[in-house]
Amino acid sequence: MATTSNGIAVSISNTPQATNDVFTSAQTGLTDNALTTVYLNVMANDLGGAAKTLYSLDSGTEVTVALEQTALLTQDTARAEAVSTDYSAHGAHIWITSDGKVGYDASHLDASWLSNSFNTLGYAQDSFTYAIRLGNGTLSWATAYVDIAPPAPVVALAHDTGSSATDHITSDCTLSVGGIAHGATIQYSTDNGAHWNTSFSAVEGTNTVLVRQIDVAGNASAASSCCFTLDTTAAAAPGVALAVDSGSSAVDHVTNVGTLNVTGVESGATVQYSVDGGAHWSTS
């Protein structure tokens, strides 16, 4: 608690009145793909009743507790982002709002810190400190932690089989998933996000698969989608005949014209030929 002299705070200590907070990505919507401004109610779990007010903010990066407490002794009178000079531990712009919350502008977060956190730790958690003033004028301080979920995965078909490698028509539904945070769990959904699992089963025909990652702290990324058509049904054998059976007989298969008449070919299919019993195939 702070002691006061003539109503001015001169010291502060970490006591139970102000309680540490953890704001998850599920609560704030903050992800590496959505670094927006959110408003954090840090006093929701603090003691002190209705008379308490949010007094000051700081990055929480002071090297000693004494220095941190000193930094929080100065009251923040600004109530707008434009005039606040406070930042979180990793660069988010923070300020006290007119209704007693903390404005948190995540667009200012250090991009290198975010990337390194996901790649090495497997999660990204920012923080800042705050002090509350109780009804009797005393101060109490705590730390607020803010989780940032990892980026949406990079998803593509591992093998786009068939005549085109870019038409998303394939006989192989294996997905290639990249951009995964260290230790994260990959999840898939085939019902537009209603249910998630660590694997999926594609169906014959059109598929839309959502893919997300869950970091080691339990924060879910935004989802990426991959749309493809799965075709594992073998085409029916085509009908084949000589286009021209020349000579004295039109049915003896003795001809001087090697052109074939191929029928019953599936739309979009590629016709291939083999002259060595199927050991090798080509389009002519």
List the predicted regions and their residue ranges:
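Acidic, turn/loop-rich segments in luminal/extracellular domains of secretory-pathway
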Residues: 1-2, 76-150, 192-206, 214-219, ...
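Extracellular interdomain linkers/hinges and stalk-like, low-complexity segments
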Residues: 1-59, 127, 131-152, 233-234
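Short, solvent-exposed loop/turn segments enriched in Ser/Thr/Gly
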Residues: 33-41, 119-128, 170-171, 207, ...
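Acidic, Ser/Thr
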Residues: 43-60, 176-182, 261-266
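Low-complexity, disordered linker/stalk regions enriched in Pro/Thr/Ser/Gly
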Residues: 151-284
